Amino acid sequence: MREENNFNKNLKALSGFEYNNLRKKLEDLKELREFTFTQGKDNLDINIIKKRNLKKMYQDPIKELEKNLEYFKDFARYPVLFFYGFGNGILYKILLQNQALKRIIIFEKELELIFLALNFIDFSKDLSLGRLIILHHDDINLPKMDKVFRLIGDLFYRSYNLHIANDFYEHYKEDILKLNKLNMQTIKNHNLMHGNDPKDALQGIEQFVYNLPQMITHPSYKELLSKRKGISDTAIIVSTGPSLTKQLPLLKKYASKATIFCADSSYPILAKHGIKPDYVCMLERDEIVAECFNNDFKDFDKDIIFLVASLVHKKTISYLEKNQRKYILIIKGQPFARCLGLDDYGYISGGMSVSHMAYELAENLGHKNIILIGQDLAYAKDGQTHSQGFIHANLHNGDYERDLDRFSTTAYGGNGKVQSSEIWTLFRQIFENFIAFSKSKTYNCTEGGARIESAIEKPFKELCEDLLENKKDKKFKKLQVLNTKEQVKLGLKIYQKIKKNMNLSLNFKKECKKVQKQIHNLTHGKNKLSLEQINQNIDKIKEKLSNKKYLFLQEILGPTLHHEQSILTPLYLKDIKDESDKQNKLFAWIYAHESLIENIIELLEVQDKRLKIAILPLQDFLEKKKAL
């Protein structure tokens, strides 16, 4: 039965790390217990039969294939197609002849059906090129799907549709619904990661530029890594969930044996209990978060380093400097900052929460073991959102009632369910993704709240005794800053680069205005240019935005480009039947870009105004040093 040639070629093509599990299971499969097959005189006439009830997969394999091929003519421009069920594989082999189709992603629960299809057909070339991706049911989880959707590209999420291979797979309805829910959640997470508000992006850019003098006059992230990487094996990340309170006595006992990273909101709580963290982290840009540092703990702050994202609110810096706290500004990997050549001061992706940031820093500093405490990501039984002593507790009144039974998830330890929220669900899923691909061992010792998949659940006391009992007290080296001459040199380089980018932005805006006028003339019957010419000019604008030279604009324009262009996706994918259809589609395509270009112009104008003010502290710094 086995076509050695096809199967072996396909198996070799499943060579990537992601296929390790599937490849091994296919190699170990010695006999078919659930399914068999029949083949007619025609090579396309392959049917599959379930042994238990003799149910056929196809009533007529060739007729069903013809019907499917006719149906998928409307999907000729789609770069990605998703299917549940491998079937006999023939449909996919034919669809892959369309070079516009970049990937087919197949989800299959039955290992034997994957085995059969890989025997029937040679998919080796498409598997090697990644044009065909096979996902066995046992290997599907959130981190895996996150990786798949990153591979696909964001702008085609709106075209996502899970096609069922044929009626045979209706028996897997429950599995299909679960899978579809997982995929939709992954798409939603990716959209949220892009951000949906250019105002947030603008605030981040403005505050980053405003904070530049403080960044270059303090130690760099590179200095931190070079002096302190690998000094300690174990990091404890302290978050502010309701379960934190019960862990504080044990944390105090072992604080000198591990590196303590704490969230900005847990810092006042630790200070109150006399537990000194090594690092206090802050990620968010909002003014209200700065209030976590509006305090004075005197000598307690000695030797603590505050690791804050470079886009934090200016009040954060004021509070840190008021009490002479040591701090480092670390650049998030945003396009505007990356274009300034400040690699020594970055970069962190930071996830979406301060705990994600702390986790990334702990991993980058070489900790082999990372322990999470206070990471509930769920409401307490009494509806509390955070630990006792959380300074913003009043802002969460009514949250429990709002979210009740909407976002419930598996409890820590796997016993029952706990109530969560939409944002905590997203935070948990990001953590699960981080942990799944981390080189460190991650222990969740929260002993409450939600289960975080991939993290090892263990009592905090037991783990401290195992990992920390006989450890010596940690010792950290002091960090150095650039000398004044180097600070001025770097500051001048940044200043000139920002000014250059502001001029590029101004010229780009002028080009956008020209195209805006062309579209306006077209829609008002005054067009001097053909549809093709206007469309080419729109394409030139998009090409410039994808050029490395204009990468700095991706941050302010990113949310708008992502969301507006995802709305354009269905129009882009629409199949063209004839010349009239082509002209109608081209007109609709151009007209649909009018609001996008209008938004681009408005955002560039606002950014220019705000940058002129935000750059003043850097300008003042350089003028005082007589560099300008």
Region spans (language model):
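Acidic/Gly/His-enriched mid-domain segments of enzyme catalytic cores or analogous surface patches
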Residues: 114-197, 271-357, 361-365, 570-628
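Class I S-adenosylmethionine
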Residues: 1-80, 88-94, 201-225
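Aromatic- and Gly/Pro-rich donor/ligand-binding loops
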Residues: 181-233, 244
